[in-house]
Each structure stands twice: as C-alpha cells, then as structure tokens.
Amino acid sequence: MKVRASVKKLCRNCKIVKRNGVVRVICSAEPKHKQRQG
C-alpha cells in the first residue's frame, strides 16, 4: 500500500474507489498498485 498525495491508475486493471471519504486504488492484477490518498 502506497500513501500518496495524488493517486493514479497505474494499469488498466486499477480501479479508483472512495471508502469512508478516503480515495483508494485497488488492483486485481497487481497488488503492488494498491494506493491510498493522504
């Protein structure tokens, strides 16, 4: 899980999701692509 000021999709499998007011990126293909904004 990377914590970044701006989250971006890193591949075509990445999805941007907002959970409890926190923007996250989840990726089924590459777990290393998980990110959280903050």
Curated annotation (Swiss-Prot):
Keywords: Ribonucleoprotein, Ribosomal protein. InterPro entries: Ribosomal_bL36 (IPR000473), Ribosomal_bL36_sp (IPR035977). The gene is rpmJ1. It comes from the Bacteria. It comes from Pectobacterium atrosepticum (strain SCRI 1043 / ATCC BAA-672) (Erwinia carotovora subsp. atroseptica). This is Large ribosomal subunit protein bL36A. GO terms for molecular function: structural constituent of ribosome. The keyword Ribosomal protein applies. GO terms for biological process: translation. Signal peptide: none annotated. Transmembrane segments: none annotated. One of its GO terms (cellular component) is ribonucleoprotein complex. Pfam families: Ribosomal_L36. The keyword Metal-binding does not apply. Belongs to the bacterial ribosomal protein bL36 family.
